[in-house]
């Protein structure tokens, strides 16, 4: 980076995307400061590495900064942003800073409505297994790293590309991955055509020598692959129309086995089996994510045997089918799923992994706008649950809308799920009584799955701690 820039300040530094970039810059030797409204583990980790971070936002916080980095969640009237502009200090969007880091390496950017974080982690693991030591900026905590970031000495930077506000268009990766493309973040895009155009623009930015790795199972992404006439493209998926295919998928508990077939229709070569993979994650969606990572690894000539070993030892990502507690009495899982497609995939994986056990879903809806946009699908995505307990909607800064959802909250969703599911569905008790309520619903051998992108993970860990300490979980 230009030598005049030495001190970089992050507004909202505790966010998962911001903290990863901040950690990379710290490791590269920059002075990093930041602010956030609340404390969390990301902030503690950055402080331990030398960042100066204050709680709350004040104009004085940017003192000495050469640049101020913001996420899309930071408003224009934030006192630190206003102070920076008054002092003519550059205010840099998070994605622009990530793009600057990508200029120093060959970029591998993983985009998609779902599966970005897991796929990013898998790509990093496969490159690491080949001693390529990539730099990593992820949207979740990789368990093997204990962080969402890593500064490697290799030639590649692997990152999650966030499409939520269109800022992934600032990136210029060498390899672009698209896992899927569903209607989401419509408050930003307005129409699904705008979403399609954004993903088209993202993939189009790869150079002529680059590669687009696209999920051929998803109809929208498959159409995108057909449009990329002047780009190198590899498709992957479970269907027999793709270049890299998974077959003979078998799930035992949370372990999945499958065979990988490579097709080469463009050059007339015969299809061949590459071998069998053992993956310590359940679900066809994770098989698909793994195929994407394998496609990237094969492009970079990672030996197959190293891929097999790396995947067998892959420890996963926090809050992605995160097994918090397992014993004969109960199994407790924490998962980030908050979109109907994600919830359906997670619940199917749970049902396949625990076919003889009762499945209890504890769901915290995230944002009024998302519930309104996807109400039809939210009411139908819990078909693999026996019990569904719905928490109040996590606002994430949104105000209640006019109409039944704003007036009655999550009870509207409870009633909708009841109409379209055979599960027992109820509203979870308030903060003071939720543990008592949940504990009273459980039976021996139940599988409890906490779902959501808000603060539901805190409850999941609290509830699991109660069981692990052999205390009464109804009191947590």
UniProtKB/Swiss-Prot annotation:
GO terms for molecular function: ATP binding; UDP-N-acetylmuramate-L-alanine ligase activity. It catalyses: UDP-N-acetyl-alpha-D-muramate + L-alanine + ATP = UDP-N-acetyl-alpha-D-muramoyl-L-alanine + ADP + phosphate + H(+). ATP binds at residues 112-118. It comes from the Bacteria. Keywords: ATP-binding, Cell cycle, Cell division, Cell shape, Cell wall biogenesis/degradation, Cytoplasm, Ligase, Nucleotide-binding, Peptidoglycan synthesis. One of its GO terms (biological process) is peptidoglycan biosynthetic process. It is found in: Cytoplasm. Its main location: cytoplasm. Transmembrane segments: none annotated. It is an enzyme of class 6 (ligase). Pathway: Cell wall biogenesis; peptidoglycan biosynthesis. Its EC number is 6.3.2.8. GO terms for cellular component: cytoplasm. It holds the Pfam family Mur_ligase_M. Cell wall formation. NCBIfam families: murC. Belongs to the MurCDEF family. This is UDP-N-acetylmuramate--L-alanine ligase. It comes from Magnetococcus marinus (strain ATCC BAA-1437 / JCM 17883 / MC-1).
């Amino acid at each position: 980076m230009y030598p005049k820039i030495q001190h970089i300040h992050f507004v909202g530094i505790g966010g998962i995307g911001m903290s990863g970039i901040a950690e990379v810059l710290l490791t590269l030797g920059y002075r990093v400061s930041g602010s956030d409204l609340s404390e969390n583990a990301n902030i503690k980790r950055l402080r331990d590495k030398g960042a100066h971070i204050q709680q709350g936002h004040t104009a004085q916080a940017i003192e000495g900064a050469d640049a101020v980095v913001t996420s899309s969640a930071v408003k224009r009237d934030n006192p630190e942003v206003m102070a920076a502009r008054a002092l003519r200090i550059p205010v840099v969007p998070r994605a622009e800073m990530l793009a600057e880091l990508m200029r120093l390496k060959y970029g591998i950017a993983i985009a998609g409505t779902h599966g970005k974080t897991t796929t990013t982690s898998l790509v990093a693991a496969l490159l690491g297994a080949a001693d390529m030591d990539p730099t990593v900026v992820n949207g979740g905590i990789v368990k093997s790293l204990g962080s969402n970031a890593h500064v490697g000495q290799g030639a590649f930077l692997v990152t999650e590309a966030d499409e939520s506000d269109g800022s992934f268009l600032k990136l210029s990766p060498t390899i672009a991955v698209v896992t899927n493309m569903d209607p989401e973040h419509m408050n930003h895009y307005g129409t699904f055509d705008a979403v399609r155009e954004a993903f088209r623009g993202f993939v189009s930015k790869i150079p002529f020598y680059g590669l687009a790795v696209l999920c051929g199972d998803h109809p929208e992404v498959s159409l995108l692959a057909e449009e990329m006439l002047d780009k190198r493209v590899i498709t992957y998926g479970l269907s027999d129309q793709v270049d890299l295919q998974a077959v003979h998928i078998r799930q035992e508990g949370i372990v999945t086995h499958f065979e990988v077939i490579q097709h080469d229709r463009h050059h007339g070569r015969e299809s061949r089996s590459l071998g069998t993979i053992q993956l310590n994650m359940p679900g066809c969606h994770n098989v698909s994510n793994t195929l994407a990572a394998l496609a990237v690894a094969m492009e970079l000539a990672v030996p197959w045997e190293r891929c097999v070993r790396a995947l067998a030892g892959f420890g996963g990502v926090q809050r992605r089918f995160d097994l918090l507690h397992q014993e004969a009495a109960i199994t407790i899982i924490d998962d980030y799923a908050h979109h109907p497609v994600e919830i359906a995939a997670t619940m199917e994986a749970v049902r396949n992994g625990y076919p003889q056990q009762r499945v209890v879903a504890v769901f915290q809806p995230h944002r009024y706008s998302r519930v309104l946009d996807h109400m039809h699908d939210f009411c139908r995505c819990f078909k693999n649950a026996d019990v569904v307990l719905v928490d109040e909607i996590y606002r994430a800064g949104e105000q209640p809308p006019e109409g039944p959802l704003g007036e009655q909250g999550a009870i509207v969703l409870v009633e909708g799920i009841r109409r379209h599911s055979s599960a027992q569905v109820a509203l979870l008790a308030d903060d003071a009584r939720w543990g008592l309520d949940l504990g009273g619903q459980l039976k021996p051998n139940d599988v409890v799955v906490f779902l959501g992108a808000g603060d539901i993970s805190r409850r999941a860990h609290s509830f699991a701690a109660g069981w692990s300490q052999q205390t009464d979980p109804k009191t947590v």
